[in-house]
Amino acid sequence: MKRKSSHYNDAHASHINEDIEESYKDLYNNLSPSSTILLLLYARWFPATLIHFLDKYYTSTPILIDMIHKQCIYNPPKGSLHVQLEYYLAFLNRMALIFDRFPDLFPTEISKVKFFTKDFSKKDKLTALDTYRSFPGSTWKTIVTFATQEVFYLPEGLEPLKRDFSSMDKLKLIGKITYKLRLKGDTALKFAYLHAPSDVRDKVFDDAFWQEIITPKASLEQQSNNIPTGIQDSSKYTVNGPTERDNKSMKSFVRSFFTSTDSSVADTTIIPSMTQQFDKDPSTLVQSSIDKEIQVKEDGTTSSVAVNAETAVQNVNGTIKESQGTESISFASKNNSAPSADANNGNMTKLVSKEKAFLNTVTTPNADLIISEEDELTEMTLRTANGSEPTKKSNRSEQSKTVANTNVGSKNGTTPRSFAQKSSKRIKPTEGSANLNTVTELTGIGSRIAMNGSSVKASNISTEKSKTIAKPKPAKELSPQATLNSPIQSAEAGNVELKLHPQTPDRIVKVERKVHSLNMTLRSPKAGSAGKENSWRSKYLSEGKNSKAKYTAKQPSYDRAGSSLASPTKSSASPLVKAPKETPERLCTENQSTENEDQANLKESELPKEKSDIQPKNSRSTIEYIETSTRVYEMPKDTIPSRFKTSISTEVHDGRLKKYPYYHVKTPEKGTTVVSRTVTSPKSGAYASPSKASYNQDSSPNASLEQCFVQRSPSKMLTTLRNNSSTFPSLRKNAMIARKSTADSLSSPKRQSVPSTPKASLSPRVHKSMTYSPSEASPLYANKSPKSSTMVPLMKYKSGLNEGMRTSSIYSSTSSPYIRDQYFLNRMLTNGSHNGSPSWRDGLL
């Protein structure tokens, strides 16, 4: 792909200008799977740029959209969080080489995107585990939580980052990375060590480093209150923090871990407070809250953000019982040597060049994880198993033979600790082991590492009963809940500044940016079995241990021009406006579209399965409708496509207002019924006055969106819904009555007398004030008072869609991931600190 480097010179402005836009057109005309991956990585750092690009050109770039979803955003492999993290790290390694091949595809300077970072300077408690689930990597701050430790990725500042990827040694310009490690066990340190440059790795053998990173901070009262009740011998807890002997033990353990190549490291002495075992069920432990102050601000200065670990502990305890019997997942490389300080990127090159590497493998439920040793590179292959969990209860001898499984809190009291000697083996599930605490051996760049990890949900990967190769020595293992309360766990870990290694792209920080607010047209899954085919949708479309909801893994195929060959719909030519979908944690306003013609062309197998035994989370097709006030958010003219109007919608969420951006398609396809809400802006400015809001209701399938406006007061509606959780069902009932009573008049010729407004009077971005009284507009609100605060505009549906409230055809050509994007962005813009409470959800759902 040839590019003109003249587009990317030092004369660039700090914002997206027309030169870059022309370059994007060049990229668009030469799209290929490799270049789309590169564009995807670019979007992880500059999401607004890619959103702008896709808004203009996405109609004929389905390969890009498909690649974004398949490669990294919505299909992390099953398993614990660090398994997914390794997946993304491998992806970033692959992307780094593409940077080297196409250096001038990226501008040398781009300003920071305040839109994605402005709300995070506020002090608010963030639960690390919840943060990871809600918006992984979307915020310049990625918090990865395991059962026993938290690792914080914090770019040093949010100042504009200069990009010049003309060669691999320029990757260091990405910026400095600050690791804040909370030493709950040794795993956080191992993790940082694996991804640290050589000069930082040497610190492991520096006594001054240990003096700094292990410092007693907890008070006597705090420690005495935090001693768990289930610990066998609480006297081993030191009162005044870790002793010198503890520090030496930790140093000895870590150093031997990073230098040993056999399983003898399991016998290494560990800090006494880290070797406690449970004599009761782990869920009986006292849950303590350990708050960690992390420093991050927009301008790079420091401000306090309290991260509460209590919820993470509760999540662990809440799922230990139900995850009994799940197994460890082992990633082992043939190269069993410890990470070397001078590791090169040789294996990473193999990872990029090898077709059947991490990125082409997606874990599906009920599949065997087979690790081959044909190459130094760990290669994952998936084979469908019988789909049932092993019923035979593992005895102690079987459990002791299990490879790479810590089984913290297992019933026999002792758990094996070892590292696989051979990389081709099938891991055996063990009864009585909590999946949250499995050790996973990760294949780094020519190295191997084991971690204590946790998964939010119990993994559903069942494996055949087969003998494991290694027979590790049983040894006491870390206890996540116990170490959570030990004195050393509450110590301030200190800051370890890690600089990116010039020649090792694996040192890039995981910046997993979700691409938000994209207008995507993707087909919904067809009938099929997720257990028989590897589906990139399976992570989100299958739920629970024995999900019976059936989905196909068949993916849409595209011709070179980019039009969809597999989809029977016409959506690739005329994309629908995607609606933020109603999820269990939010109720949103949405732009809705139904295509009657496309609905008629759908095959029966492609219609959503309404009667599935288990309705997958985030894939419901029911749309609840709420009116909200809307405000125009003006952006520079060169960043907004002319056929889109960017808005920020304010919605009711647990008594608070939250914002999310969405796009309105200005001109709908003929035959498409659109219900859209636009904004009347009496004045210009960054935020126009929300005093008046106008709502569009089209009168015929080919009517313009601006044909009908109804003026009303939105604030009363918000207040009513916020204070009365039972309002909405009655609103829907009234709406149904109004729909039936006005069905004839909606389609009658008299409808043509509705006052219409010429399109010429409308700005492509901001509507001028245009108001009509409800009585003039339509008989739609005939049974409603014009000033009623509970008035709900009716939506026109294709007949037969479940009394008009089912909008199946909207999502017949849509996949749920985009809908979740709106949700993630919504959570991100509101700090992600509050989930929807059942109090207001019950009345609305």
From Swiss-Prot:
Q: Kindly list the positions at which Phosphoserine occurs in this protein.
A: 567
**Sorted alphabetically, which keywords does the UniProt record give?**
Mitochondrion, Phosphoprotein
Biased composition of type Polar residues is found at 224-241, 400-422, 674-683, 691-701, 743-760
GO CC annotations, alphabetized: mitochondrion
In this chain, composition skew of type Basic and acidic residues spans 390-399, 534-546, 579-588, 600-614
Taxonomically, the superkingdom here is Eukaryota
Give the start-end ranges of region Disordered: 224-244, 324-346, 383-434, 456-485, 519-619, 674-701, 739-785
Entry keyword annotation includes GTP-binding: no
Signal sequence interval, chain numbering: none
Q: Where in the cell is it found?
A: Mitochondrion
Q: What is this protein called?
A: Uncharacterized protein C428.10
